[in-house]
């Protein structure tokens, strides 16, 4: 009977691999959520639903001049 119980229990390395997989999955979801930017009614939100200030939002495929002008505009309002 003792051999049967030992075979039924998962090895500690298997449990460790499963826990590490879950940790990596959660971290990747968190990283991806921080890169998603949504515009709703003129306000920007990140992937987690937190409101972003205009100075924190930079268009992904904008040229350098567009980014520079946007930063200058946001500095004038503050």
Curated annotation (Swiss-Prot):
Gene Ontology cellular component terms for the protein in this record: membrane
Regions that span the bilayer: 13-33
Subcellular location: Membrane
Chief location category: membrane
Alphabetical UniProt keywords: Membrane, Transmembrane, Transmembrane helix
Topological relation to the membrane, as annotated: Single-pass membrane protein
Identification of the protein by name: Uncharacterized protein MJ0270
Species of provenance: Methanocaldococcus jannaschii (strain ATCC 43067 / DSM 2661 / JAL-1 / JCM 10045 / NBRC 100440) (Methanococcus jannaschii)
